[in-house]
């Protein structure tokens, strides 16, 4: 695991601020995951597409659903990115 060094004249205060900021960012990302997942599920139900099949590239793309499916694919990509960021944040450790 890599180490990131922060230099400050107020280490205790900086440590506290960093912990608060990381916690706040984790909560925001967690909420974003919930909202984005709900939106993806809503679009999947509307288009009657299986999310696993869509992710695997196996779902048909009827022309009349093209825009909805593009939106759904965008939501799934966004969900993946948000989940990746959240996983990274959850591995961060602030050392004394």
Description of each model-found segment:
Residues 1-24, 57:
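Short, charge-rich amphipathic alpha-helices with coiled-coil/heptad character
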């Amino acid at each position: 695991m890599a180490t990131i060094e922060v230099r400050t004249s107020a280490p205790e205060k900086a440590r506290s601020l960093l912990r608060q900021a990381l916690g706040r960012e984790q909560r925001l990302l967690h909420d974003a995951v919930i909202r984005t997942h709900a939106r993806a599920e809503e679009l999947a139900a509307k288009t009657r597409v299986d999310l696993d099949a869509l992710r695997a590239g196996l779902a048909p793309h009827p022309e009349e659903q093209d825009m909805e499916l593009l939106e759904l694919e965008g939501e799934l990509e966004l969900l993946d990115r948000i989940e990746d960021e959240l996983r990274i944040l959850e591995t961060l450790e602030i050392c004394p």
